Design a protein with these regions (language model features):
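N-terminal, positively charged/glycine-rich alpha-helical extensions of SAM-dependent methyltransferases
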Residues: 1-17
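Conserved alpha-helix/loop element of class I SAM-dependent methyltransferases that forms part
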Residues: 24-44
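A short acidic, Gly/Pro-enriched loop at the edge of an enzyme's catalytic core
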Residues: 101-112
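A short glycine-rich, Lys/Arg-flanked "PGG" loop and its adjoining helix->strand segment in the class I
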Residues: 125-140
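Conserved catalytic/acceptor-binding region of the Class I
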Residues: 140-170
Length: 170
């Protein structure tokens, strides 16, 4: 499955103003992720990396839940990364904008979290390996993604939609 990252970046950049107004599914995902994260971590994470922070939907929940000065953000769209940091009072020096598949991550983390981002990876297996190397000894990776049958009804009705991987392809 070929992903055009430039196109993905352009589309998210263009929709950044109206994104939160239309992100009903993403908001539901974030609300379900926090309890999953809490049940997965054994201690309060000191260093947290959010991949694909976008407008900051998950960022705000992570900040509220863990009140962490060790929250680091990544997004493919540089402006979104800095916007999410500013809105959520995260140090701008904690932003790693760009394609996480290509970025060098200089730190290790207790928690790596991502909501609705991994479906955009071009090399998911390599990226999982890379991220696992950036986890502390008891670190946890928690993510959500869209799958092959996401919004199937829209595809059947309109003949259009996005192609996502099935779980075996991740």
């Amino acid at each position: 499955m070929e992903i055009n990252k430039e196109e993905v970046e352009q589309r998210f950049r263009r929709s950044r103003i109206s994104y939160n107004d239309n992100a009903r599914v993403q908001k539901m995902v974030v609300n379900r992720m926090i309890p999953m994260i809490l049940s997965s971590v054994k201690r309060v994470p000191e260093k947290i990396l959010e991949i694909g922070c976008g407008t900051g939907l998950l960022t705000s929940q992570l900040q509220r839940t863990f009140s962490s000065d060790g929250l680091y953000l990544n997004d493919l769209v540089e402006e979104l990364c800095y916007h999410a940091a500013t809105v959520n009072r995260v140090s701008l020096t904690h932003c790693f904008p760009g394609d996480v598949e290509k970025l060098f991550l200089p730190l290790s983390f207790d928690l790596i979290a991502s909501a609705s981002t991994f479906q955009w990876f071009t090399t998911p297996e390599e990226t999982f390996k890379k991220l696992s190397k950036r986890l502390e000894q008891r670190g946890v990776l928690v993510f959500s993604t869209f799958g092959k049958f996401n919004l199937r009804e829209i595809r059947l009705t309109t003949g259009g939609g996005l192609d996502y991987r099935n779980k075996e392809e991740l």
